[in-house]
Design a protein with these regions (language model features):
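Active-site proximal loop and beta-alpha junction motif in alpha/beta enzyme cores
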Residues: 1-92, 98-153
């Protein structure tokens, strides 16, 4: 599946528990993903990510993701926030997979392919990098419907 290209990939400063943290933001139209190295918060990463999402919500767009990324293990745990509606740990995140792929390609300044283990299975990103920019992102993976119904908000 061809995915949209990021508008920008940049380092942003955040504060949590009086600690200033510099993290990579991958900005797409409609969602911004913040890459959080799993090693930053260790065993408490999930709880800290949930708290960070609530604290940082006022300085981020209405829809954003905090991506707990373990580069060594090539794993991703996506937490996605929709302002005033939800804060959900997703089993798989296509835009998050794209964000990690775009970040790695931009950092390495070359085409990359990465497979990311996520709670619901493995997703793959193939990213083209040319002339100083990400020029193409494609993702693949298995998708299954795990619930059906009507949501009343």
């Amino acid at each position: 599946v061809a995915m949209p290209l990021p508008q920008c990939i940049e380092t942003r400063a955040f504060t949590l528990d009086d600690e200033r943290i510099e993290l990579t933001a991958v900005v797409f139209a409609g969602i911004t993903h913040i890459l959080v190295p799993v090693s930053l918060w260790g065993e408490n990463a999930a709880k800290k990510a949930e708290r960070a999402a609530r604290v940082w919500a006022k300085e981020l767009p209405p829809v954003f993701g905090l991506l707990l990324f373990d580069e060594k293990e090539k794993s991703l745990k996506p937490l996605v926030a929709v302002e005033d509606v939800s804060l959900i740990w997703e089993r798989g995140c296509g835009s998050g997979t794209s964000a990690v792929g775009a970040y790695l390609a931009a950092r390495e300044k070359k085409d990359i392919t990465v497979s990311l283990k996520q709670p619901g299975g493995v997703m793959h990103a193939t990213v083209s990098y040319q002339n100083g920019a990400v020029t193409k992102i494609e993702i693949t993976g298995s998708v299954a419907i795990v619930a059906e119904g009507t949501a009343y908000l």
